[in-house]
UniProtKB/Swiss-Prot annotation:
It catalyses: 2 D-alanine + ATP = D-alanyl-D-alanine + ADP + phosphate + H(+). Cell wall formation. The keyword Nucleotidyltransferase does not apply. This is D-alanine--D-alanine ligase A. It is an enzyme of class 6 (ligase). Disulfide bonds: none annotated. Belongs to the D-alanine--D-alanine ligase family. The keyword Nucleus does not apply. Its cofactor is Mg(2+); Mn(2+).
Length: 357
């Protein structure tokens, strides 16, 4: 009888998206095929401690997969090919894992940090590599690379702590309203819509509370369209039909609350009601954006569709959400690839990439 592949599922983490990660992990833990995989849940506390969880007990409450304060602390052994070192009283050590599946969002999980740790540990891991993870996480860097690849993006100005620039200069360059957002955060954390000079200072201060660099970006009057990209072990890409996010008017834009905590915060429509030529262009542009950033395995590519039919790439998310309302799995389901199959493909990709190195 073939042994099951041991999959360490990482969730929680130090970032502001800790709770989002828990919601995503609950779905992955529910969807993964336990006849094929031995699941090794590892909950990461807000202070960054990794704690091994019994597979049968890492279920979900209303807030997602549990991150208890107890549990055996573990770490990946550098060069250990998946060996876990545990801090236990009796000295017993857990079995090695075959692949690490980071279900982590934001800094310390989506930005190349965990990917680099897995590389040092010489263990297979799901998702993009170090460079693509870091580049996509930094909205400023990602925009530069996408623009260099010939893809249209929204106009923006990058500001740093201590070097913000004046409202007059930025409004003159981008027009009003515009958005201020942390350069390296997700889930709309720290994002503000600026309508006038009075709101500018507070918006920048909020963005820089989450990062040392902020992006000031023009307001784009358009529909929010998203495509899921899934790469198989042979390098071939599947790009889903586009889906659409329709935020409720009361939120003004697709806020963190609208995404995760307001059942009526937005409508997720898959597939999007768009003309065939828009479907074709989003598919082609999503694949180009994926390759431009050097992505591997998976990404969600977000667009703005303007009234004249033009498309702008908004961002590339290398560890998209797996929550109940998240677009990534929903859009792939519309392409005929179910949740469990997506997980299979991602794990197969991770193992094949590691074998090839």
């Amino acid at each position: 009888m073939k042994e099951k592949t041991r999959v360490a599922i990482l969730y929680g983490g130090r970032s502001a998206e800790h709770d989002v990660s828990r919601l995503s992990a609950a779905n992955v833990l529910k969807a993964i095929d336990r006849t094929r995989y031995e699941v090794v849940p590892i909950a990461i506390s807000r202070d960054g401690r990794w704690r091994l969880q019994p597979s049968s007990e890492a279920g979900a409450d209303g807030a997602g997969a549990q991150v208890p304060e107890d549990g055996v602390e573990v770490a990946l052994l550098p060069g250990g090919k998946g060996r876990l070192v545990a801090l236990t009283k009796n000295g017993e050590q857990p079995d090695p894992v075959d692949v690490v599946f980071p279900v982590l969002h934001g800094p310390f999980g989506e930005d190349g940090s965990v990917q680099g740790y897995a590389e040092v540990a010489d263990v297979a891991y799901v998702g993009c590599g170090i460079l693509a993870s870091a580049a996509a996480m930094d909205k400023d860097v990602a925009k530069r690379l996408l623009r260099e690849a010939g893809l249209a993006v929204a106009r923006s100005v990058t500001v740093l702590k201590g070097d913000v620039g004046s409202f007059q200069e930025i409004a003159g360059a981008l027009g009003l309203p515009f958005f201020a957002k942390p350069a390296r955060q997700g889930s709309s954390f720290g994002v503000s819509k600026v309508h006038d000079r009075d709101g500018f200072e507070q918006a920048v201060e909020t963005a820089l509370r989450y990062d040392s660099k902020a992006l000031i970006e023009e307001f784009v009057d358009g529909r929010e369209i998203e495509c899921s990209v899934l790469e198989r072990a042979d390098g071939s890409l599947t790009v889903s039909p586009p889906g659409e996010i329709i935020p409720a008017d009361k939120h003004g834009f697709y806020t963190y609350e609208a995404k995760y905590f307001d059942a009526e915060g937005a409508v997720v429509k898959v597939p999007a009601d768009v003309p065939a030529d828009v479907v074709a262009r989003t598919s082609e542009m999503a694949a180009r954006a994926f390759r431009a950033l050097g992505c591997e395995a998976m990404a969600r590519v977000d667009f703005f569709l303007r009234a004249d039919g033009s498309l702008l790439v908004n961002e590339v998310n290398t560890l998209p959400g797996f929550t109940d309302i998240s677009m990534y799995a929903k859009a792939l389901a519309a392409a005929g690839i179910g949740y469990s199959k997506v997980i299979d493909v991602l794990i197969e990709h991770a193992l094949a990439r590691h074998r090839a190195r």
